[in-house]
Amino acid sequence: MVVLPLFVLAQQSPVEQVRKYVQTQEGNILKAYQQFLSIPNVASDMPNIERNAAWIAEQMRSLQMDKVQLLYPATKGVPPAVYGEVVTPGATQTLIFYAHYDGQPVDSTKWASGLHPFKPSLYTDALHKGGKPIAFEQTRYEPQWRIYGRGASDDKAGVMAILQAYAALKANGIMPKVNMKFFFEGEEEAGSDHLHEILEANQALLKGDLWVICDGPVHQSGQQQIVFGVRGDTHLEVTVFGPKRPLHSGHYGNWAPNPGMMLSKLLASMKDASGKVLVKGFYDDVTPLSAEEKKALAKVPSVDAALQKELGIARVENPSQSLAEAINQPSLNINGITVAGTGKYSANVIPIKAVASIDLRLVVGNDWKRQQDKVVKHIQSQGYFVTTNEPTDEERMRYPKIAMVIRSGGYNAQKTSMLHPLAQKVVQAVTTAQGKVVLTPTLGGSLPLFVFEQYLKTPPITVPIANHDNNQHAENENIRLKNLFEGIVTFASIMLLPR
């Protein structure tokens, strides 16, 4: 660790001191992060999930945080949240910092050659920009270098940035201006189905004035953004049935119904060519944007043309609206379709069934159960008998079109007023640290933030730090070093909110 002369430190602002600290500690920060990313973090893998939780708790204890503990839900066999706190003498306001340490399930065979989701690798740039692997131990680190690994951006980066922000303040003898509580969830990527149990059982412990969420990417323009809402989320799995056994497509083609064709037509009936969802009543419950939100949207930098070029998209679904406008509407997306084999596994058959996974994103006003109901009614309107089980022989002979619909859990969207006084202080602090900040009414992604208001009566806002091209939820997930290091600075600035 480099010790700076006291007269130099005295001339620097607290944020500048933090930035300098991060620069001198980059190697140590990355060494710790490499250890963290090496622990598998799929929510269903409880032994490794608990290893992650124990690692975080140990980091918090090393920072001398108070009341460090694991908060388990009432339901057994479910990931814990990791909690700790720092009480600041004389502080009158309490911020609760949130990130999640679990990650999406992985298929390591889909990752690029040389990469493994739980063997983090350092590259000189993004893979698509020609990045090459290098050792973690370096004498200096360039801002465009990237770490590849599951959770590198979503959302172990959030955990690391928050912890290192406090470490930087502590190392420089800088006192936070607010009371701070830290809450790191372990079930977010599995739907946070039991988060409410933890919140309900620990209402006094989790009392605060504002939740500050670290999850998601910065704006596609590269600017820091602060987000005042998130979309809700729920899923449906739809299975359409054909013959009871696979049939030879030559012997039975033009005669036996093909479930792949049936499912394709059913899915196509749900959206028109402009991307509008045709499910009856899909948009009826949407709460209109406020005047303040419309004003903020008008100031969001336009990135559509650049993104189309980056992603190789000639035409977006609805050219009349921007991406910023589109994510403020509910959506229906097909996550995946399974019918029969393709490529070397292709066979001349009429398959027995076809399955689609449907993702519904919600905005304020939508109820996730009602939104599911609307889709099910649409399926029925297309002539399908809807069941929740495999069809019986009697049902197969009675109904020509059968769809089995399995509903997942879900959660509603959430918004905090863009005029909230404490949120405005966060905006001022981050703007001072990072310059121009994009203010966004809603994040395109989803987080179960409505439960914080429902059970704790405390509003949340989101301060993302990951690069927009981080491949979260997919193979080759990564974090750009500049985003990680500046994320530490950003969260340190929030911890220094004026009283």
Where are these regions (language model features)?
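Metal-dependent amide/peptide-bond hydrolase catalytic core
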Residues: Q11-S13, H235-E237, F241-N478, K482-E486
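A non-catalytic alpha/beta surface segment that caps or lines the substrate-entry region
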Residues: A32, V42-I96, D102, K119, ...
